A protein has these predicted regions:
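Extended alpha-helical targeting/anchoring segments
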Residues: 1-340, 480
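Helix-start/capping segments and mature chain N-termini
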Residues: 177, 210, 214, 315-410, ...
Length: 559
């Protein structure tokens, strides 16, 4: 929309207007229901599906190397006197699991902001957690509060206060903020009565769940309240363009890798007396639902930062990623866990053995848990993980006399969203040489991203295993909605073809097991689509295998 309001900024869709998305939507209502926060939450909850809901950490569409090259161009333009600052942005691909309405509630509760918005339309949804006011009108008074300057939060209070004070004292951030204040004073002058534009405050620090933000406030008395005058004068907000505004917009149009869409636009409302509009940052725009999955949606989150002459490209890239951390801030209500095999050594050898000799696949479990924690926003400390495993070993040794003759144990470590670790263990009894399998009656949603992680949200698996055990079987095999074989409730499935093992690819919808990863890395297994017929034939011919890190690879057959 900014390009359409400013004739000197080229329209990216010029010559092919059929591809241009709508520049905006306006809805007019005869009446509106004004809800309290609790009423709004209850309204949304009543429409949300009862599923775990959250976000997987976004995947950057712009590499650090390409970003650095873009920053070099911006700094050259600043050196040439073409611009003073550019707010350079780029998109992240984001995957949601669960209902978008529940995701929005979780995000809003974890990071309350004054200008959040949830838009639910048949063809798309918007989850905006914007903390930034574009403008607010009350009678003939208008207020703007640009946001420019970011620093991360700290866990401890003293460190967090130090971060806030450092941001407030930062000459670089104050200079950027003041540059945008001057720009918005100029914009307000277009619609304000002469002499009424006032800077109410400078360099305020606002704390949010993952970041501190620097803001300033400016107000004025309007000479008009018409949106048809306010929008052309003020849009887009200077905090997300740079300065000079038009020159910065021209550079943005030429250098950014994709149109911004709603990101850095505005979402607002208007009545006869009042208007309020946000700057649509921290805003996730979901792709249209495909109808293939109720458990997963994809979307785009824009991130960016203001670039000036002394900006450090690596630091700016890190700041952009930091601004996306709010997506994984809420506790999703489940734990991540790993189930490890512990082989208790002889007491006289115990003190000399490394952890990997006691927990044979320790490294694979640690790697998978660390990766899952990063993707889903869980706190994870590798030293803490190692420490609790040593504690469990000591506990089992202490109680070993009550388990005479048992040398192998099942150890489960649960990781909470806040990084806390809990352990449980039990003896690991032997199994038959060939294990029996049944078919699970439920189908897996192969698009559900949570299937790729080992979480406590696994009632579907637990129920299938319970049925299998009742039928004297080890496990139940699941298929996805397309009828392709995925995995067992507690094992990965393999079919032996000559000297090679075939196992379903992760895209079918399954947990990438630790044993499975080992076999793939060693070249002993490869991914291949498997059908029910493939499994039946392998069972008849003695080529069917299932396996996990706890039990290893086991011959199997269908009951």
């Amino acid at each position: 929309m900014g390009a359409l309001l400013e004739a000197t900024v080229e329209n990216r869709y010029a010559g092919d207007e059929t591809k241009q998305p709508p520049i905006g939507y306006i809805w007019v209502f005869n009446e509106a229901a004004w809800l309290t926060q609790a009423q709004a939450d209850a309204w949304l909850l009543a429409r949300a599906a009862d599923l775990p809901a959250g976000c997987v950490r976004g995947c950057a569409e712009l590499s650090p190397e390409t970003y650095i090259k873009k920053i070099v161009k911006i700094r050259q333009a600043i050196a040439d006197g073409e611009i003073y600052q550019v707010n350079y942005t780029w998109p992240l691909d984001v995957t949601l699991y669960g209902d978008p309405a529940q995701v929005f509630i979780n995000l809003a509760q974890a990071q309350p902001t004054a200008y959040a918005a949830y838009i639910d339309m048949p063809e798309y949804q918007v989850l905006s957690l914007s903390p930034e006011l574009f403008f607010a009108v009350d009678g003939d008074r208008i207020k703007v509060r640009p946001m420019k300057g970011t620093s991360p939060r700290c866990v401890d209070h003293e460190g967090d206060q130090a971060q806030a004070q450092a941001l407030k004292a930062s000459e670089k951030n104050r200079a950027e903020n003041l540059m945008i204040v001057d720009l918005l004073r100029n914009d307000l002058g277009r619609v304000a009565k002469p002499g009424t534009v006032i800077v109410d405050s400078l360099f305020d620090i606002e704390a949010y769940a993952t970041v501190h933000q620097m803001t300033s406030s400016i107000s004025a008395t309007l000479n008009t309240r018409r949106l048809t005058a306010l929008i052309p004068a003020l849009f887009p907000c200077g905090s997300i363009t740079g300065a000079p505004k038009v020159a910065a917009m021209q550079k943005i149009n030429a250098w950014e890798i994709a149109p911004r869409g709603l990101y850095t636009g505005t979402i607002g409302w208007a009545t006869a007396e009042k208007i309020q509009a946000n700057v649509a940052i921290r805003t996730l725009v979901l792709d249209p639902p495909t109808g293939e999955s109720l458990a997963a949606r994809t979307g785009i989150l824009g991130v960016g930062s203001g670039i000036v002459w002394d900006s450090n490209a690596e630091a700016e890239y890190a700041e952009c990623l930091l601004k996306s951390d709010f997506l994984v801030k809420p506790d999703p209500g489940f734990t991540l866990f790993e189930t490890l095999r512990l082989d208790l050594p002889a007491a006289e050898l115990e003190a000399t053995l490394p952890l990997v000799e006691i927990y044979p696949r320790y490294r694979g479990h640690r790697s998978r848990l660390s990766a899952a924690a990063f993707s889903l926003g869980f706190g994870f400390n590798e030293e803490g993980f190692e420490s609790i495993l040593w504690q469990v070993k000591a506990e089992i040794r202490e109680k070993a006399p009550g388990n005479a003759g048992i040398k192998s144990y099942r150890v489960r470590i649960d990781l909470g969203h806040d990084g806390t670790l809990h352990s449980s263990w039990s003896a690991l009894p032997p199994l038959a040489d060939r294990v029996a399998l049944i078919w699970a009656t439920e189908r897996l949603d192969g698009f559900n991203p949570l299937l790729r992680y080992k979480t406590s949200a696994r009632s579907l698996y637990d129920a299938a295993i319970e049925i299998a055990v009742a039928q004297q079987a080890f496990d139940a095999l699941f298929c996805n909605q397309a009828g392709l074989v995925c995995e067992g409730g507690r094992s990965n499935v393999f079919v032996k073809e000559g000297n090679r093992l075939l196992t379903p690819p992760v895209r079918c919808g399954l947990l990438p097991g630790v044993l499975r990863a080992e076999l793939l890395a060693r070249g002993e297994a490869s991914e291949s689509l498997l059908t029910i017929s493939d499994i039946k034939a392998a069972s008849r011919e003695g080529r069917l295998r299932v396996g996990n890190a706890l039990r290893g690879l086991m011959p199997a057959y269908l009951k």
